[in-house]
Amino acid sequence: MAVFTEVSFDEAAAFLRFLNLGQLQNIKGAAGGIENTNYFVDTDQGQYVLTLFERLTFEQLPFYLHLMKHLATRGIPVPDPVADAKGNILHRLKGKPAAVVNKLRGHSELAPTPLHCAGVGEMLARLHLAGLDYERQQPNLRGLAWWNETVPVVLPYLTEEQRSLILGELAYQNHIAASSGYRSLPRGAIHADLFRDNVMFENGQLTGFFDFYFAGCDTFLYDIGICLNDWCIDLESGRLDTTRADAFMAAYQTVRPLTAQERTLLPALQRAGAFRFWLSRLWDFHLPRDAAMLKPHDPGHFERVLRERLAHPYLL
């Protein structure tokens, strides 16, 4: 979360009254994240998150907001977008697309145990199954096509060694994506950004997934790879903790067992997840946008993760 577009107390208060959410009592800009403008807002009726979308368009956003509605109706704990009197859940504020969702209970678990990882794995599998009948379609906007467009943009900022790594991995991922095995992988709506800070826990129990604004239609295995690369690693080295990874995968497979092809391609899709976030962090770091409270992530972290996945693939 970040603040690119400043919203005053009075502007937020009027917007929340329009949505029948009561009187604004407090508003606070959210410093984490790098994509959208986010404010935590408290009213006399509850606590909410106000988001102004800085890159996603009015045409793209219904996919994300209605996906959250769809998942919520199927028992997945996710933020619920607030509708206006006409039933619209996508709004406009200061000329930008905007949405308000309820704030989930609890806190992020930034030092997860195997038990936390198991909870995330089980809920991710439930999410994948719950989304199978979601009718809206939208590609993963940070997928292979974006990688091929963006690698040439960041190449001038890299060392020779980094260029070799990023070009080699891009070629490998293009090769994997063209294979018959990859095309046979189960797919549907995925979260695509389910990091430790996008999950809430309360008293050890998982209370919700949030920040669905990188979601899209892609392979479930890619979503799994992204989670393993964050929930189940040592953050300093990027090294995988197999105890946490095994707990995550065992819990996931109690709900949706992996196919034989998924088991084979898991190392490749873990590499894909590391590559995606290394590339996007390079892009954000070297080509930043103006924003209050913006804290770009260190690109080096996911470079280390990618190198670890290359050196020590995780096999089921």
UniProtKB/Swiss-Prot annotation:
<dbReference type="InterPro" id="IPR011009">
    <property type="entry name" value="Kinase-like_dom_sf"/>
</dbReference>
<keyword id="KW-0791">Threonine biosynthesis</keyword>
<dbReference type="InterPro" id="IPR005280">
    <property type="entry name" value="Homoserine_kinase_II"/>
</dbReference>
<dbReference type="GO" id="GO:0005524">
    <property type="term" value="F:ATP binding"/>
</dbReference>
<dbReference type="InterPro" id="IPR002575">
    <property type="entry name" value="Aminoglycoside_PTrfase"/>
</dbReference>
<dbReference type="Pfam" id="PF01636">
    <property type="entry name" value="APH"/>
</dbReference>
<keyword id="KW-0028">Amino-acid biosynthesis</keyword>
<protein>
    <recommendedName>
        <fullName>Homoserine kinase</fullName>
        <ecNumber>2.7.1.39</ecNumber>
    </recommendedName>
</protein>
<dbReference type="GO" id="GO:0009088">
    <property type="term" value="P:threonine biosynthetic process"/>
</dbReference>
<keyword id="KW-0547">Nucleotide-binding</keyword>
<dbReference type="InterPro" id="IPR050249">
    <property type="entry name" value="Pseudomonas-type_ThrB"/>
</dbReference>
<keyword id="KW-0418">Kinase</keyword>
<comment type="similarity">
    <text>Belongs to the pseudomonas-type ThrB family.</text>
</comment>
<keyword id="KW-0067">ATP-binding</keyword>
<dbReference type="GO" id="GO:0004413">
    <property type="term" value="F:homoserine kinase activity"/>
</dbReference>
<comment type="pathway">
    <text>Amino-acid biosynthesis; L-threonine biosynthesis; L-threonine from L-aspartate: step 4/5.</text>
</comment>
<keyword id="KW-0808">Transferase</keyword>
